[in-house]
A protein has these predicted regions:
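Short loop segments at secondary-structure junctions
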Residues: 7-8, 74-78, 113-115
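Active-site-adjacent beta-strand/loop module that shapes the phosphate/pyrophosphate-binding cleft
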Residues: 59-97, 109, 131
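Residues that scaffold the ATP/ADP-binding catalytic core of kinase and kinase-like folds
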Residues: 13, 29, 119
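Non-DNA-binding regulatory cores of transcription-related proteins
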Residues: 100-106
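Residues that flank catalytic or metal-binding motifs in active/ligand-binding sites
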Residues: 17, 67, 104
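The catalytic Nudix box helix
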Residues: 21-57, 112
């Protein structure tokens, strides 16, 4: 699973629950969810998303009410390198009046699903569970016939 470590001073030095699926906001009336997901991938990581047939893993609602639609694609041919991370501006230190730019994410890497679980933001773990269920249903187990 390709996950990205969130950038900025708050996330610096944190690992557990500090990684995220590349994602972002969109207007559902003017942009289909998959187009938005591909655009956000490009904006956050600075590279084109992998080519292939995308699967809609589901739409998940965070405790904040934010809705995230997650897609998966076979990315085995996708190299997790050459990223140019998007940036955001933040007053830092707080109440200092100084604005600084920070990367939206500071690194991205492939992780086995079990290693990704504790590192993913808690609100995104249901998406990981859905991905695991999808993979289990779509990949025949060795030695079994039907």
């Amino acid at each position: 699973m390709l996950v990205a470590h969130m950038g900025g001073p708050y996330w610096s030095g944190k690992d557990d629950a500090a990684w995220s699926i590349p994602k972002g906001e969109y207007d559902a009336e003017s942009e289909p969810p998959l187009d938005a997901a591909r655009r956000e991938f490009r904006e956050e990581l600075g590279v084109a998303p992998p080519d292939g047939e995308y699967t809609d893993v589901g739409t998940f609602v965070y405790s904040s009410g934010k809705r995230v639609t997650v897609f998966a694609v076979d990315g085995r041919a996708f190299a997790a390198s050459g990223f140019t991370f998007g940036e955001f501006e933040l007053e830092w230190p707080p109440r200092s009046g100084r604005r600084q730019s920070f990367p939206e994410v500071d690194r991205a890497e492939w992780m086995p699903l079990d290693a990704a679980r504790p590192r993913l933001m808690k609100g995104q773990r249901p998406a990981l569970d859905a991905l695991v269920a999808h993979l289990a249903a779509s990949v025949p187990l060795a030695g079994l016939s039907g």
